Every structure is written in structure tokens, then in C-alpha cells.
UniProtKB/Swiss-Prot annotation:
Methylates ribosomal protein L11. CDD domains: AdoMet_MTases. This is Ribosomal protein L11 methyltransferase. Belongs to the methyltransferase superfamily. PrmA family. It is found in: Cytoplasm. Its main location: cytoplasm. GO terms for cellular component: cytoplasm. The gene is prmA. Pfam families: PrmA (PF06325). GO terms for biological process: methylation. Keywords: Cytoplasm, Methyltransferase, S-adenosyl-L-methionine, Transferase. Its EC number is 2.1.1.-. One of its GO terms (molecular function) is protein-lysine N-methyltransferase activity.
Amino acid sequence: METWQEVTVHVHRDAQEAVSHVLIETGSQGVAIADSADYIGQKDRFGELYPDVEQSDMIAITAYYPSSTNLADIIATINEQLAELASFGLQVGQVTVDSQELAEEDWADNWKKYYEPARITHDLTIVPSWTDYDASAGEKVIKLDPGMAFGTGTHPTTKMSLFALEQILRGGETVIDVGTGSGVLSIASSLLGAKTIYAYDLDDVAVRVAQDNIDLNQGTDNIHVAAGDLLKGVSQEADVIVANILADILVLLTDDAYRLVKKEGYLILSGIISEKLDMVLEAAFSAGFFLETHMVQGEWNALVFKKTDDISGVIGG
């Protein structure tokens, strides 16, 4: 019987998506995220509140590696990447890393217990791929395989991106998704009526993961996934460009985004910690955008900019 190695990284909630990305890049066959915030004040299936869940800013991200993997090298790489993330200003907290061996059947089911359907916005619900789910009238279901995911849609940065897309898209638009990761924003754009979506990621693993998740959802043939370095070399104009990545990377794409966004189109930027907010605003204003909406969840910010000559009700430019 094949055995697996389980590695659990205890890290600050703000680093969830970045650390999940690192674990996938180092060869993990899946990630699971345990976050006390998902349970605070919620009821279990029998109607009882979870009594023993204590709120914490720290979460546990668990990854699974084949038994042949050299765990010492993996853990060293994880620690190096965490130090680099901290140097970008991302809060990682007091990190600890644990490991243990698991039998095949334990690995196959262990991570699934962390995921249940989650209503993210008024219309959008994210459902694990193995779950049978009866959608209500008007509810749009995004199927994801969280075992592969770079983000399952429940992180504040992704939630705010999804909310912005839901507010903007009315049908028939062209959307560009920069740093697509799990593909969740592209899938949502398709479900919300966008005509064509172009999804780019520098990471070949992310491109594969995004395509696999897209294939789980019917009617998403209008999503085109490809490897790409932000918006370099892209000539396709878009009604909406969305990017949910680190602030230091967002500032590198604002000029290209202005070149590609159509008149009266939108740029959605998320993944911005508060201390980097002014830097992103300055880059977008310098490119020529006007700020229409600023959303905040905890230390995270999302910004919706517009390319327009009508500056009533908008800021900057």
C-alpha cells in the first residue's frame, strides 16, 4: 500500500493563497485549509453551534506528498519562500511546519472534510467537485477541485474580486483574468455572462489547474487559458481586466491594463494589503485610471478602476 507524507503549515490567514501556491509548486498532490473563521458563529448539520472553536488569525494549510519525496528539502523550500513572502510585506505570522505519514486511503479522504459548498456572493456559490448540490433559482454554481486549488474562492481577496465581477458584468463582455490560479474568477465571469474570457498565469501548474477546474463546469468553452507573464504581449482589448495577485506585481501591469481596457471599461485589482494600498493607487492613477470602488475586508483591499472621460463620481486619474 502506498503511503503519503502530510505537511501542515501554520501561518497567518493573510498568507493563505500565497502559501497554497508554494505547496503546489513544491509537488503537493493537494492542499486543505483549516480556518477557525469558517466556523465562528456557524451551526453544524444538527443545528448546534461549534462550541470549542477559538478565533485565531492563524490557519493550518495541509499538503500531501508521495512517500518518495524528500521532506527535508520540501520544508527548507517552504521556509525560504515564506521568508520571501514576508519581505514583500505579506503577514505570515509565527510559522510552524509539522509532518506525518498517511496511508493511501487516509490521504484520499482526509482533505475533503475541510470543504463544503460556500455562498460567496448574492449569486455565486462555490461547490467542491465531488458534492451533489441543488442550486436555488438564480444561483450560479462554480465547481472547483480544492485539492488542486491555488485558492478556493473563500479568501477575502477572491471574495471581493467575485463581488466586483458580479456588480460589473451584464453579459457579452470580454474579460482578461491575470494570474488566474484556480481559474475561479474566469469561471465566475463565464457564469455571469461574459462572452469571452482570456486567463493567463506565469505558472504552468496554475495553467493546468485552471483548465482542470474549468472543465468541471459546463458552458465554459468561452474561457481560453494560456501561460503568460502578466499582460506582456497581449493585444486583445477587454471590457474588464481582473487581477488578484500581490500588490508588488499589480503595479507592474497597470500601464498594459490601460492600453488594453476599452473606453468605459474596468480594471479590478485585489490582493492588496493595507500598507501597499497607496502604491497601487498611485500606479493606477499614473496609468490614467479613475477609482470607482474601494472594498476592504480586514487587512485586504480590492479596487475597481474605470477608464473614462466622465469623472463624475470617480477619484484620481
